[in-house]
Structures are given as structure tokens and as C-alpha cells.
């Protein structure tokens, strides 16, 4: 795939790109993370890549590979790769997923990209990760919907994804019938991590998939009695003058408005608890307003430099939010928020590209984070940051992934079971 041309600052000032040209450039350059930066054998998404050299033995990210499937759809639709190339890459990914070590049909957080063997995330987290697996299936189910032609290659792709989807035992993660899902399980440690999945956070997609599953579904009551019965679920308090329907104070990191909603369309989506478009728009507005107010007086923050979410810092990976502000801006926070705050996101995009330029722009798009206060610019790109940039910009531009996911029969049935209302269900 030919590399998009990077231009000098003087060239950009003399001949600035239009909004559409800039979106094209950023999506396409970021796509390279999942195309050229993927594992060389399986094509699954590496957890992270570096600006110039790659670390040996970097594990693949299961959730990031779900975003990779979405990126392949966008790349195919926009003509960066052919339909046949995208099919072949997905087939290679499925080759690894089919032979990988999984646990009651669920995958670990990290695994080897050649053998599919589990790479432990921590001492006790050496087995299934229900949320990472959910992000994987969100992408694979979109791919199953997109590759819909009645030709042998696409029929086989759909069958293979369908088999993985049917074999995922969501019900196992109720621990014998509890009214809540549990995040982790392993053969050696069982449920020792003991992390119940309760809202509000990035895990709405997990409950939706668990209720929608074709074979090992869980009852809808788990959504209401487990997910929604948390002290951090209902909020309805103002922050930065904006009411936040759900979630922790200040809304938490912005990826909460992105991960579940790369496929799940929040426009017009309601249930008894919230209007999810309002939730995500208001969360974004709070994050933006906080960065503009900049109570810590960090250098660089402002109307064209904002966005707090999980990402790399000089001291490691951290979940940035208004109540955990380290002076680090993560470009994915603003760029994946185009559907919710297009004007503010475009201002940030232009500043990132035109003003900060090569300090944060590289072979796979924007690096994971930067701090002008500390004069620090990340050397890394992360799958779970790059993926939502591509997916959410595409949803802003065309709604492609939202249309695919919301048209899936099992998902429509699951939304109805949970009591959701959506224009897609009319």
C-alpha cells in the first residue's frame, strides 16, 4: 500500500488540506498499523508498535484484533486494499484464532501471534478475558456482515466467524448462575481475579453480546441486576456545567464513549437508564471543557489540544481523565470523538498534524500520547488507540460500521431483550 505523503510545515501552511483530505490522510495512515504493522504470520494486531523499530516477541492484542477487523472493512471500502486482500488477511487471522488456546470459547488479553498460546497479563490473569473477547467479536461480527457475497471465499469467512461466535460460552462467566458477569477465568486460578463486570464503563458491548449469543446466552436479568446495579452507574450530576447521565465523576477516560460504540450505534439508542447519544456527547463535552479550563495550567492544553483517555505516559500506561490528569494528551481521545464533537475534534486534528507535526506524527499515524508540559512525545502506537480512530472517524463520515453491526439479526434480538429502543429496531 503506497504511503500517504507527509508534508513539511511550510507546505502545509501554503497549501492546507481540506477537512475531508485530512480525514482521509489520518484514517489511511492509521490503517497502516493494522496492515503493515500486524503480526507477520497471523495478521492479528500487535499490542503496540514503535515509531522506528519493533520489539521482538510483542504479543498480539485480542481486543485490538477486533479493531483490526473493523479497520480491514474500512480499508476495503475506501479502496486502500482490495476486497480479496482483506479477505485473505481475515482468513489468516481466523487461522490463528481457531488454533489458539481459549477458555470456554473465550480468549485471553494477550497471546502469541504465531501459535495462539496465551501470554499472561498478570500472575492470576492467565486465561480468559471476557471484555477483550467482546471487542474481538464486535469486529468479527461486523466482518461477517460486510463480506456478504455468495462466493466460496466469503461464505467460508462467514462460516468460520459463526463457528467461533457459537462456541463462546458467555454463560460460564456467571459462575454458576450469579446475576453478574465476571471478567476473568483461567484453568489454574479459576475466578481468583474476582472482577465483576458492573457499569458504567467500556463493557456495555459485553452484556449485549452475552445476551445476543446464539448458543450460550445469558438472561437479560444480568444486565439489569448486575451491570446496572452499581454505585457508579447512574450519575445525573453536572460537571463543567454539563449533566452526566451515567458513570463515575467527570465521566472517566474517553474510551468509555468509544470502545462499545465502534459497532453499537448510540444515535437514538435508549433504554430505561439513559439516552446513549446524550451520554457520549455529554461525556465528550465534559472532557473537552475540562481541558480548555485546564485547572493545572498544563502547557499546550486548550480548544485545539484536548482529550484525556487511557494511554502511554512517561511512566507507563495510565487511564487519564479529569480526575486523573497527568498533563498527557492522547490523540485518540479527540480523534475517536468525531461523531460527538466534530468541530472540536477537527480543531484538535489540525493542531496535532499542522502544529505538532513530526513530534507526534509517524508511520502509523499519531503516536499514543504527548505532554508539552514535560516535553515528552511517545515512541509508541497502541492497537486499542489506533483502532477506534479509524472506526469512529468512519462512523462520523459514513456510519458504515454502525450500519453493519446494528443490522446483525442476533444483535437486534439482543437489544430488544434488554429493552433498548433504536431507529435500527423500527
Predicted regions and their residues:
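Ser/Thr/Asn(+Pro)-rich, low-complexity disordered segments
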Residues: 2-426
